[in-house]
């Protein structure tokens, strides 16, 4: 197991050499009180340009995060240049005029989204296990998911054990209790912000280590 985590660290550090995220000005939302548990994550995600509000000065607190919105945020986090092919890779991503078209195609090109199904379900709410899987795949760590599956601490995860285990061990995502993850539960926008911010912080903390 120690060899697995050494490989994980090495792969992440290698990835970081090309990672960059631009920062924007500080942003506040009228529906996010300063006392909210995710207030700092939301504010910093907006500041770094990872997430935007839903309009009218609101973040959309409590709303579910769509798969398209999360894929878009990952593209921004990873600094991927958007691609816009003439034909989409999924049956439900064929309209090039859709705001998420290029992000879906870019996430697919980088392996964050898979072609296992002919549909990407862009407007569906992303589940907690899908969020873990998409994030780990965006980091280029899918190769470790098979080995990591036996290290998953949550008894209610059966489909994406390796991805959840990796995301958990990296400190990117948390369980709802010591042994429960609620993998099929839909993630809210603030929960997605927390995962994105933790990913950002872990990556940039590792960058600082390699530079010293």
What are these regions (language model features)?
Residues 2-39, 52-101, 109-132, 137-162, ...:
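Feature responds to low-complexity, polar/acidic, surface-exposed segments characteristic
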Residues 165:
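Hydrophobic alpha-helical
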Residues 168-170:
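GST-like fold's C-terminal all-alpha helical module
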